[in-house]
Swiss-Prot record:
The lineage of its organism: Bacteria, Bacillati, Bacillota, Bacilli, Bacillales. Belongs to the carbohydrate kinase PfkB family. LacC subfamily. It is an enzyme of class 2 (transferase). CDD domains: FruK_PfkB_like. It catalyses: D-tagatofuranose 6-phosphate + ATP = D-tagatofuranose 1,6-bisphosphate + ADP + H(+). It comes from Staphylococcus aureus (strain JH9). This is Tagatose-6-phosphate kinase. One of its GO terms (cellular component) is cytosol. InterPro entries: Carboh/pur_kinase_PfkB_CS (IPR002173), LacC (IPR005926), PfkB_dom (IPR011611), Ribokinase-like (IPR029056), Tagatose/fructose_Pkinase (IPR017583). PROSITE patterns: PFKB_KINASES_1 (PS00583), PFKB_KINASES_2 (PS00584). The gene is lacC.
């Protein structure tokens, strides 16, 4: 069983418009509302590829119940921790080939709720074999909250796949308890090191070999349309991917995380892990719906991916 954590989920609302008129009335014909958050995208893709998955995180109020019901309708198991605050909305306005987003900050978690979730998590940890943590921390939690979760996973021997960025990731990296996998994009990688971006292989090798990343088994760096660069223990890989028609890239990173987590759970070899992860990321990009993959195209893309030891 895989446990996914989305500590700051949202109800994602999409408003497609022919044109966005500022300081005027905009009427929307079709509205899409989904259970959102990076971890829930990971959850949906894991469910689609047939992995046993359980979703958790904080939810509150009517919007929190909306998320729970959406997962129920999709036959996805969940064990959220209820809080006093209201789960947030995140609004995307699609207009003239552009996307304007309005993102609520979300509820503030108090000390009692923060401690209560840790106890809740410890109970869930007893019955899972991998944990995928995605996205930002809600207001009120200390920056080391993910590190506290990772410490408990490490004590139980449960691998952690972590997808976050900025100060939250920096805090985890400076902590003695390390995730099994991190998945920064190339910009995030060099920001962590306060270095100028450099896509050359030698620079990437030096970057992921810095002391900041010591103790992390897998570092998988997204290069966007150029594929990926990865380090597994002391081995480096370059992943070349085919050119595809991209319909909606949002959620592709989350689908990649789903592939990594699935491969970790099933003890797949390095090449298959990297190919599965990138295949699912590309499949998501070919769909309008976030966190959705058409598995009919899986084998074709999987076989076109090239993984080279460098």
């Amino acid at each position: 069983m895989i446990l996914t954590l989305t500590l700051n989920p949202s109800v994602d609302i999409s408003y497609p418009l022919t044109a966005l008129k500022l300081d005027d009335v905009n009427r929307v014909q079709e509205v899409s509302k989904t259970a959102g958050g990076k971890g829930l995208n990971v959850t949906r893709v894991l469910a689609q590829v047939g992995e046993p998955v359980l979703a958790s995180g904080f939810i509150g109020g009517e919007l929190g119940q909306f998320i729970a019901k959406k997962l129920d309708h999709a036959d996805i198991k969940h064990a959220f921790y209820n809080i006093k605050g209201e789960t947030r909305n995140c609004i995307a306005i699609l207009h003239e080939g552009q996307q304007t987003e309005i993102l609520e900050q979300g509820p503030e978690i108090d000390n009692q709720e923060a401690a209560g979730f840790i106890k809740h998590f410890e109970q869930l940890l007893e019955k899972v074999e991998a944990v995928a943590i995605s996205g930002s921390l809600p207001k009120g939690l200390n920056q080391d909250y993910y590190a506290q979760i990772i410490e408990r996973c490490q004590n139980k021997g449960v691998p952690v796949i972590l997808d976050c960025s900025g100060a939250t990731l920096q805090t985890v990296l400076e902590n003695p308890y390390k995730p099994t996998v991190i998945k920064p994009n190339i910009s995030e990688l060099y920001q962590l090191l306060n270095q100028p971006l450099d896509e050359s292989l030698e620079s990437l090798k030096q970057a992921v070999s810095q002391p900041l990343f010591e103790g992390i088994e897998w570092i998988i760096v997204s290069l966007g349309a150029q594929g990926a660069f990865a380090k597994h223990n002391h081995t480096f890989y370059r992943v070349n991917i085919p050119t595809i028609n991209v319909l909606n890239p949002v959620g592709s990173g989350d689908s990649t995380v789903a592939g990594i987590t699935s491969a970790i759970l099933n003890h797949e070899n390095d090449h298959d892990l990297l190919k599965k992860a990138n295949t699912l990321g590309m499949l998501n990009a070919q769909e309008a719906q976030t966190g959705y993959v058409n598995l009919n195209n899986y084998d074709e893309l999987f076989n076109q991916i090239e993984v080279l030891e460098v």
